[in-house]
């Protein structure tokens, strides 16, 4: 083998690392040193030349290309792509989301109830304020019935009770929702009325037939009708009888039965009389508090008692001025009496029989004579009271008097005033 033979060694490497030229030179020198003895003893004429160093291709599944420009810049690497890099990039992004284990189940904000059951007024697909309330989506529910829309009351052509208009802003729908849930309608709390104080003015006008009671006294004023020409006034300064009130004159057409008001346990009855117009031996007595009316089958009279004198140290003056009512329906007998009752334990009745004055003409409403009857000194007080009590009883038991008392004539067309005739002197002597 001549010295002209030359051997070329080719180093094949398949790594990604850069080839170190120093290592290659040293390795080539070592290999040439080993091969020199062989060249000296061999006659072979084979020549080995190292033409170029070829590196292995890079697998795409282990290396991600940054860009197409980077692949073109690498002269040593030749990469063949099996698919479109853009699609690969989208697939990779989807795979990355799956690797994070994040599952989107809903959305937040104004349309949070779009994918979940919701009442009609919260629907995101059909806005409650801008669309018809009759429309609904797959997730809409009735706010009142709490069932999937439409409910039986969804749209029944009555706008006030259609459940499609229900919302959580009005009180009526809240009450109906509570009624469907519990079975009873909630009631509103009742408000208590505020107490108010009514103040009556002090200066008030007294109405007709109204009785005014003054403190520490008993005063009664009765206003008679306009046809009566006189006033009936009674004053009694008794402090404990403020509750007593004199009754006004009853209607003459409605009086039928005899009423005698007395209470023997609390007071003693005193007959107030007026003696006038005596004819012959008889004495005519007119009673102020007795109104006698006679019809075709009955007659009635009313006698009002005096007030109760509890304290004997007080003085009572009773003055009565009464006149006869003109008319054809009734006869009203008037009386004027002056009684002075004084004493501390005993009462004195003074009757003056000597002052009896017979009237020359019949009494009328305009012409009335008065007389004062004083008890004679020989007559006892108890006897007089007994006689008066018997007279009361007789009047009450005999509504249609006969005998000494002349019955009243039937009412006629003419105006008249008749009297009750009674023998008072004979009655006292009995």
UniProtKB/Swiss-Prot annotation:
Alphabetical UniProt keywords: Hypersensitive response, Nucleus, Plant defense
Region (Disordered) residue spans: 1-21
Subunit and interaction comment: Interacts with RPM1 (via its NB-ARC domain). Binds to ARF1 in the nucleus.
Function: Resistance protein interactor which positively enhances RPM1-mediated resistance to necrotrophic bacterial pathogens Pseudomonas syringae pv. tomato DC3000 harboring type III effector protein AvrRpm1 or AvrB, but prevents the hypersensitive response (HR) controlled by RPM1. Together with ARF1, promotes leaf senescence and cell death, probably by facilitating the translocation of ARF1 into the nucleus, and activates ROS-related enzymes (e.g. POD, CAT and SOD).
Protein name: RPM1 interacting protein 13
Gene: RIN13
A GO CC term assigned to this protein in UniProt: nucleus
Chain segments annotated as coiled-coil in the UniProt record: none
Chief subcellular location: nucleus
